Amino acid sequence: MPKIGCALFFAFLLSPTWAGCSLVPNAAAIPTREEIGRSCDGRPIEAVTMGNGVEVVLVLASIHGSEPAGTPLVERLFEHLTAHPELLDGRTLISVPIVNPDGYAKRQRLNSNGVDLNRNFPAKNRQERRRHGVSGLSEPESRALAELLARHPPARIVSIHQPVACVDWDGPARAIAAAMADACPLPLRRLGSMPGSLGSYAGIDLGIPIVTFELRPGDEAMDATELWGDYGPAILAFLAFAK
């Protein structure tokens, strides 16, 4: 091959597009991780951001450490969005894959102070009980999440739990929950607002649509690919939901 032809050929291969495919990753679709706080035992609480659109959506998992299946499901979401960055058009995804890192490490519901983080939010229906914490946001994990909500007010939230096997909601989120239930094996079911829960605080008090996505018992035995096969379409329905 003549030198000029060879040079043009390799310039083509190294160009941003080749055979119709982008060879340069979309920077907005690369997950960026930020420490937003530390747990009682000093473990980092990380938020992952993807996209740079105006609409903010929040995806949470493992606020109860004994309900761990949501974490690999969320990590699989990041992989899917990296491969399909168009799903982030107009949106910013913020996710906390492990809200309760101490509980997650120990596979226990509570944090290391013996507090149920999903009863530690300053909701109007909060109840004073030892396992709910000495006051609303007394725990570093719930404070980190509340501060994240204040810094980046989301258009909607999904919090992934186990093992009730249903799609629940608080606040103006019934239509979102129904769209998610239509896309997965879980039924739509209203469980009611729990005292001091994130659903009560964000959904009822702040008016942010929030879905509690309750996976099945035993789903933690599934790998990320299996979880994504069952629940990925519902997570994508949440992400793409439009009023």
Descriptions of predicted regions:
Residues 39-40, 54-63, 67-191, 200, ...:
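Active-site/substrate-binding loop(s) of hydrolase catalytic cores
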Residues 219-243:
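His/Asp/Glu-rich mid-to-C-terminal helical/loop segments that flank catalytic regions of hydrolases
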Residues 42, 46-47, 199-201:
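Short beta-strand/turn micro-motifs at beta-sheet edges
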Residues 8-45:
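Short glycine- and acidic-rich boundary segments immediately preceding or forming the N-terminal edge
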Residues 1-8:
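Bacterial N-terminal signal peptides that target proteins for export
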Residues 46-54:
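Short beta-strand-to-loop junctions in surface cap/lid or active-site-entrance loops
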